[in-house]
């Protein structure tokens, strides 16, 4: 049996409210590090920002009219991000929990809390937090992708498929859930044809530069189940 353990980078692209334009340079961080979200915040009913895949140039986003945001919430969120980046996870968790209670309509704190829980091995808590993130910001593809990762880790494979498919529906140019859905079909749903289709799609989206994914696709084409690979979802 194959396991999803290949170390692919997480991308720091999640938004606090799940709906503003992405700010700053896209920064890839190793999946051993909790991924902080971007600083921009907005209420859950605004439109989702387009996601940017690692290696792609950022595309100009359509302007979005944002409702005023509580400056105290932004300040608290910035402090939580600083704690995450500094590795002070207990402090970050406390701050994020406080934000989810004072501003439950903002998806970002829920999403960050879910990532923090997942990396601490608290999968039920991670899934619950990320479900709240997508409920607060249902148009944010990145939150759905993160939810799928936690659901897959928790053994909720059909729910993970739904989450990845929703992320793809929301942003057809977002490559990470395409790969994650391919891995899910390959390793857990036993749908080789669908997995191969998704691997090929991912490689087309990313310029075919991922040698490991190309190898997985070749294995499926050649029907060599004895060749075991380890794989890891992308954020």
Task: Give the role of each language-model region.
Residues 27-28, 187-235:
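Terminal, low-structured helical/coil segments at or just beyond the last alpha-helical repeat
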Residues 86-98, 119-132, 154-166, 189-198, ...:
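Structural signature of tandem alpha-helical TPR/SEL1-like repeats
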Residues 66-106, 115, 119:
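Alpha-helical segment of the N-proximal tetratricopeptide repeat
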Residues 84, 111, 118, 145, ...:
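Position-specific recognition of the canonical hydrophobic site in helix A of tetratricopeptide repeat
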Residues 20-23:
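Bacterial signal peptide processing site
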Residues 102, 136, 170-171, 204-206:
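Structural marker of alpha-solenoid helical repeat scaffolds
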Residues 73, 107-108, 141-142, 175-176, ...:
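Helix-start (N-cap) detector for alpha-helical repeat units in TPR-like alpha-solenoids
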Residues 112, 146, 180, 215-216:
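Canonical tetratricopeptide repeat
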